[in-house]
Amino acid sequence: MISDRQLSILNAIVEDYVDLGQPIGSKTLIERHKLNVSPATIRNEMKQLEDLELIEKTHTSSGRYPSESGIRYYVNQLLQETSHQQQTKMQRLKDLVIENHYDLSSTLSDFANELSIASQYTTLVMRPNHKQDIINNIHLIRANAYLVIMVVVFTSGHVEHLHLASEVPLSNDELTKISNFVTAKYNEWNNHRFENELNAFVKSDTEKDFIKDMLNMIDIHFDNQSNGIFMGGKVKLIDALNESNVSSIQPILQYIESNKITQLLDEMSNTSINVKIGHEIESSLSDISIVTSEYHIDDRLKGQIAVIGPTAMNYQNVIRLLNTIW
């Protein structure tokens, strides 16, 4: 446990180090924060924080910078404070859904880019699991003799367009009947009763195969989509890392683009803000932090957001942004 003054000094060192990108000395703290104490007192308190391994001293400067433990202490205090604050939820995500005509992929891609601009860090937005949503309607449109377009409409409002290669000679009326049948029976199609209902609905094996091809395509498409990740501001992470950390950029990018990041976001899945710092993520990723939260498109459809930056991240701004997302 540290004193209130030591906590204030630790907070100031973390925030100044984020702003200035260099070790912080007692003179800088006094000038920037108008502290009404002597430099000697500040240096003594900094020595105490150093003994607690919350800050570290460089060999080339008398200043201090926060250790990973110090940043964790700072973040925990910040999360505790913000958890008691009333947050005003923004409607931007819902607005983007409408602007993109309920195209979920375009919406989440735009959302990742806008959040990256607002936070000034790299962002990831995980696509929701389609099983959270319910299919409201499936429309079939014959594009040509070889292609049928499936328009899948969900109760959340978002729409997916799938292309089914098929030369089965079905009229528009027949396609409409199949659309209505599949819409009504989609959630039952892996049930043993579905086969009986399908046999009662159509007699032709060709039409049965067409319907099964439809259902398989829908399932395969959304199983693939469930792991989709949209990235905003990829270059910001590279820019944020100092030249001395160039060697760490490649493993960081490999981590982000691998399945490991998906697994991590699943583990951190929660309605509240979660923060992982440096070695808490992986031993080779000591230079970055990941802040995650949950977003909601409606009461049913939700996914994970992550903001990725250097360990010297502006946590206050990032947490504020994620707290306002709905």
Swiss-Prot record:
Function: Negative regulator of class I heat shock genes (grpE-dnaK-dnaJ and groELS operons). Prevents heat-shock induction of these operons.
A Pfam match: HrcA
Name of the featured protein: Heat-inducible transcription repressor HrcA
NCBIfam families: hrcA (TIGR00331)
Keyword presence, Signal: no
Record's keyword terms, sorted: Repressor, Stress response, Transcription, Transcription regulation
Transcription regulation listed as a keyword: yes
Listed GO MF terms: DNA binding
Organism encoding this protein: Staphylococcus saprophyticus subsp. saprophyticus (strain ATCC 15305 / DSM 20229 / NCIMB 8711 / NCTC 7292 / S-41)
Family from the record: Belongs to the HrcA family.
Coiled coil stretches, renumbered: none
InterPro entries given in the database record: GAF-like_dom_sf, HrcA, HrcA_C, WH-like_DNA-bd_sf, WH_DNA-bd_sf, WHTH_HrcA_DNA-bd, WHTH_transcript_rep_HrcA_IDD
GO process annotations (BP): negative regulation of DNA-templated transcription
